């Protein structure tokens, strides 16, 4: 039985990259000088570096689509697929993909496949001879050589009880861009094709999970049926859907078990926590005021009452579509470490974008997707820096890599973080505390913005019943006795644990 045990999982998102291959018959060739071009990474490159990921503490990989993407531009990105049953030969073969999954399993790492039910690439083989008159939306316009109707991107039409029918139609049936035909899931043959395709990949590769791109864009009844069909076959499987909204009400709508006014049940176990991602950045960057700073994460976490299962939601500091977290936090290593400490102790499934562990950034051009997806150093012959071996990394990068490794390995073993209850206290004087508790194990997270030493009075946290207990600091091994107060000597994150 395929399953993705979400408890204790940490997802790492790499962009494929190690070698520099060109393949005859493929439209776009490798060119490392082109920031938005193919740089030649492949499946073997990931397979060869699994030891690095396991040592870091990663327990799952979400890789951008590896299916054939024979488009003339930006084909490395993967989301304009031209064959849903073929691995892109520039990445490798089906056998390479199966081998990757097998080797990952040996290391205790799950493979999450990135899938796209909403659209395909305009060079998909079936676009040359469409099997039905309604295989894609606005097909008549396409066949007449006309521009399609584009999506209005009004995702709220999925929930809006006042939405006009035309707005809902344009949202769901409109194309993203003219190179991404919008698939018509109302066609029963298309619906069956997409469901069977997902199940085939799960079974063939022994997938651990699926990340479904642009979840609100396809027909939502189909998406419920799609997820339901997979869960019927694999009851312990997990699927995460992308809803890029900063409104927790919209994100929560898509999670399985939500009490929606329209009765909609998605069968979707996990969604992506864009609201909390934004809260984390604002909480750390803002000056402490009554409605700014740490109050953003305090009140943001309070929104968990809306989610049927908060612990199954995927939280992340950044990904391949947004500025890197180190750039968002003004390249401040202390703030970036604080973000990691908070994110990795939350009642969530954390996902980290490759390079976060070495403070990769895109500050020279915020919003530039080429910089956001810069090659991981050490994957190509001739690289002067090798993050796999630490060769060429500066002091701050090495510190961050060790910091994150310590945190990830601790998280893997902490049952309080995996299964424990969460208690947090409203921030005061630039300090925020969150506790994770399971039986005798307690994990204490303290976030402190104060540049000068501050004395933290512990009487306020009496309900945690920690008095006279010994706690150990995760990062330096120092011990304290929880009694009257503790001194916070510097700005940053402190993690204390009752486990030695």
Regions from the language model: what does each represent?
Residues 1-110, 125, 177:
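N-terminal structural segment of carbohydrate-active enzymes
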Residues 1-2, 6, 12-15, 39-59, ...:
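Carbohydrate-interacting/catalytic domains
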Residues 13-17, 71-83, 117-167, 253-263, ...:
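Aromatic- and acidic-residue-enriched segments that line the glycan-binding/catalytic groove
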Residues 28-44, 80-93, 177-191, 208-217, ...:
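The substrate-binding groove and active-site-proximal loops of carbohydrate-active enzymes
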Residues 53, 63, 84, 104, ...:
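Conserved, mostly hydrophobic/aromatic
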Residues 54-61, 105-112, 206-209, 234-238, ...:
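Loop/turn elements at helix/coil->beta-strand transitions in domains of secreted/extracellular proteins
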Residues 101-102, 119, 124-128, 197-199, ...:
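Active-site-proximal helices and loops of the catalytic beta/alpha 8
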Residues 133-140, 163-205, 211, 215:
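Active-site-adjacent "subsite" loops/lids of carbohydrate-active enzymes
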């Amino acid at each position: 039985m395929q399953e993705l045990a979400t408890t204790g999982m940490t997802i790492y998102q790499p962009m494929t990259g190690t070698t520099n291959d060109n393949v005859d018959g493929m439209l776009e060739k490798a060119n490392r000088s082109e920031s938005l071009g193919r740089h030649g990474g492949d499946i073997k490159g990931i397979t060869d570096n699994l030891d690095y990921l396991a040592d870091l503490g990663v327990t799952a990989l979400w890789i951008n689509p590896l299916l054939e993407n024979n488009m003339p531009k930006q084909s490395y990105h993967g989301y304009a697929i031209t064959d849903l049953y073929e691995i892109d030969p520039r990445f490798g073969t089906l056998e390479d993909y199966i081998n990757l999954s097998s080797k990952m399993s040996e290391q205790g790492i799950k493979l999450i496949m990135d899938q796209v039910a909403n659209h395909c690439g305009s060079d998909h083989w079936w676009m040359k001879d469409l099997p039905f008159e309604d295989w894609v939306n606005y097909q008549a316009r396409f066949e007449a050589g006309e521009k399609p109707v584009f999506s209005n991107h009004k995702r709220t039409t999925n929930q809006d009880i006042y939405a006009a029918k035309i707005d809902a139609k344009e949202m769901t049936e409109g194309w993203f861009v003219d190179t991404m035909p919008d698939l018509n899931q109302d066609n029963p043959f298309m619906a069956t094709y997409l469901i069977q395709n997902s199940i085939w990949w799960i079974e063939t590769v022994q997938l651990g999970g699926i990340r479904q791109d642009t979840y609100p864009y396809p027909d939502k009844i189909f998406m419920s049926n799609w997820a339901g069909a997979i869960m019927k076959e694999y009851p312990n499987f997990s699927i995460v859907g992308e809803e890029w909204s900063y409104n927790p009400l919209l994100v929560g709508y898509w999670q399985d078990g939500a009490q929606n006014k329209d009765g909609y049940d998605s069968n979707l176990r996990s969604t992506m926590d864009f609201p909390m991602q934004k809260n984390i950045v604002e909480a750390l960057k803002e000056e402490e005021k009554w409605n700014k700073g740490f109050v953003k994460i305090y009140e943001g976490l309070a929104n968990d009452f809306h989610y049927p299962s908060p612990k199954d939601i995927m939280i992340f500091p950044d990904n391949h579509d947004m500025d890197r977290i180190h750039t968002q936090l003004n390249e401040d290593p202390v703030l970036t470490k604080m973000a990691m400490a908070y994110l990795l102790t939350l009642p969530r499934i954390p996902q980290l974008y490759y390079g976060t562990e070495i403070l990769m950034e895109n500050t020279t051009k915020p919003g530039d997707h080429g910089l956001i997806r810069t090659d991981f150093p050490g994957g190509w012959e001739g690289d002067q820096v090798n993050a796999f071996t630490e060769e060429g990394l500066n002091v701050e990068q090495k510190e961050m890599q060790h910091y994150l490794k310590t945190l990830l390995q601790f998280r893997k073993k902490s049952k309080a973080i995996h299964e424990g209850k969460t208690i947090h206290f409203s921030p005061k004087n630039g300090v925020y505390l969150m506790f994770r508790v399971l039986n005798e194990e307690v994990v204490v997270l303290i976030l402190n913005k104060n540049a000068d030493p501050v004395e933290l009075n512990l009487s306020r946290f009496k309900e945690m019943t920690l008095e006279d207990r010994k706690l150990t600091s995760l990062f330096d091994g120092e011990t304290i006795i929880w009694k009257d107060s503790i001194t916070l000597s510097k700005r940053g994150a402190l993690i204390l644990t009752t486990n030695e």
